[in-house]
A protein has these predicted regions:
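A short acidic, glycine-rich active-site loop
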Residues: 55-67
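A generic structural signal for short
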Residues: 13-14, 60-61, 86
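Conserved donor sugar-nucleotide recognition element shared by glycan-biosynthetic enzymes
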Residues: 18, 65-68, 93
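A conserved short alpha-helical segment within the catalytic HATPase_c
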Residues: 69-73
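Short secondary-structure boundary segments
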Residues: 113-115
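Structural beta-alpha unit
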Residues: 1-3, 74-110
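Short, hinge-like loop/turn segments at secondary-structure boundaries
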Residues: 53-57, 102-105
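Small/aliphatic-rich secondary-structure junction motif
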Residues: 2-52, 79
C-alpha cells in the first residue's frame, strides 16, 4: 500500500533546485489531497554581528521573503492545491527546516532542493 501524506513541506530559497522541489511538492499535495506548507528560512548566520542586524536590514529581508513566498503560494493555489500554508522564519536553515518547522507544522514529508 502506498504511503499517504497529509502535510507536505517544501523548503524554498529562490534557487532553481528549490523550484523543482516545489513542483514535485505541488504534484504530491494534489495526488494526496494534502496540505502544502511552503517554508523559507532567512539565514541570519551570514550577519557578522548583532549591530549589523538593524531594523532596516530585518525589514528588507522580511519583505523580500514575503514577496517570494506570496509568488509560490499563488502558483500552488493556481495549480489546484486547496490548503497552502506559508512559513517564514529567521535563523539557521538546517535546524529550522529539519526539525523545528516540521515539528511545529506536523509535517510528514519534507522536500528540498540540492542547494
Amino acid at each position: 500500500m502506498a504511503q499517504r501524506y497529509q502535510n507536505i513541506m517544501v523548503a524554498i530559497d529562490g534557487s532553481k533546485e528549490a523550484d523543482l522541489a516545489f513542483v514535485k511538492g505541488v504534484h504530491s499535495a494534489l495526488r494526496n489531497d494534502a496540505k502544502l506548507t511552503i517554508a523559507h528560512v532567512i539565514d541570519t548566520r551570514a550577519l557578522q554581528s548583532v549591530s549589523t542586524f538593524d531594523a532596516e536590514v530585518y525589514e528588507e529581508l522580511q519583505v523580500d521573503a514575503e514577496s517570494l513566498m506570496k509568488e509560490y503560494e499563488k502558483r500552488a493555489k493556481d495549480a489546484g492545491v486547496a490548503d497552502v500554508h506559508i512559513v517564514i522564519e529567521m535563523g539557521n536553515p538546517k535546524t529550522l527546516l529539519a526539525r523545528a518547522i516540521p515539528d511545529a507544522e506536523e509535517v510528514d514529508l519534507i522536500l528540498v532542493g540540492a542547494t
